Amino acid sequence: MKRRRRWRGWLLFPALCFCLLCEAVETNATTVTSTTAAAATTNTTVATTGTTTTSPNVTSTTSNTVTTPTTVSSVSNLTSSTTSIPISTSTVSGTRNTGNNNTTTIGTNATSPSPSVSILTTVTPAATSTISVDGVVTASDYTPTFDDLENITTTRAPTRPPAQDLCSHNLSIILYEEESQSSVDIAVDEEEPELEDDDEYDELWFPLYFEAECNRNYTLHVNHSCDYSVRQSSVSFPPWRDIDSVTFVPRNLSNCSAHGLAVIVAGNQTWYVNPFSLAHLLDAIYNVLGIEDLSANFRRQLAPYRHTLIVPQT
């Protein structure tokens, strides 16, 4: 019995030690867990209460200048549509220059062949009339000038207008004497003095009538000639229409070729004149005026005159 009790005592003692050890381990585990949780809480607090530093604001000012190009285009009393001829142009707005070759460049300056330039095809100008009284032709208050077609904007167009032959019509060209040189907006070369002697003007006939009698077939690339004469009578022809304006492309007449045109506007009609017939027409005018140089600029040579009227027969 004593052995059993002693043996039981020895068995209970390790069991008691084992229980105490287990409690100690549980206590230690609890302690470790608490400590870890506290540490985590502390770390979170530190992160939350950290100091935040804000750098000062920087202000930057940028100044931008925007330049908007402005295009001003004005054509009074004109309603137009455009078509083209195959020449190259550069536009010069509001500038009148006279070069060494005595050519005037206003609005459009023809240079070399290739891209196209638009020209006026339909015009509705202000009213104008020509009246004959006792053989003297006078104009109304409004007289069309060479500047009627100056401010046409150059654009590209796909087609070329058909050329017509002036010699296929009976026509007259009427030159009016200029009353005031200041009213003619034509640039004259400063190196070439202007004619100021009225006696020289009196030697010319005013008005001058030219007639062309041509009944023939017309071929675009064949240079036909026509006979021009000066009419001695100054009686106007009421059924014939007055031309409002005449312009030339290119403007330097010395470059007349199959690609050049004269644009003649009468009311709401427009004629495109082939340069071959135009050359003969100008030759007749120059011969009567005593101008020998056919390559001289048409606008400059006609500076003493108010207007050129070409009257085709209807």
Curated annotation (Swiss-Prot):
- Renumbered to this chain, the signal peptide range is 1-24
Deletion consequences: Deletion causes infectivity defects of about 10-fold compared to wild-type virus and leads to reduced expression of both gH/gL complexes in virions.
* Keyword Signal among UniProt keywords: yes
Which keywords label this protein?
Glycoprotein, Host endoplasmic reticulum, Signal, Virion
**Post-translational modifications:** Highly glycosylated.
Q: Name one GO cellular component term.
A: host cell endoplasmic reticulum
- Residue span of region Disordered: 47-116
> Where does the record say carbohydrate is attached?
28, 43, 57, 77, 101-102, 109, 151, 170, 217, 223, 252, 255, 268
Localisation per UniProt entry: Virion; Host endoplasmic reticulum
Highest taxon above the source species: Viruses
Q: What residue spans carry the Low complexity bias annotation?
A: 47-114
What is this protein's function per UniProt?
Answer: Chaperone protein that cooperates with UL148 to regulate the abundance of gH complexes in virion. First interactor of gH in the host endoplasmic reticulum, regulates the early folding steps of virion assembly. Then, UL148 is recruited and favors the binding of gL.
Indicate the family of this protein: Belongs to the HHV-5 UL116 protein family.
Q: Please give the subunit comment from the record.
A: Interacts with gH. Interacts with UL148.
Q: What is this protein called?
A: Uncharacterized protein UL116
Q: Which gene encodes it?
A: UL116
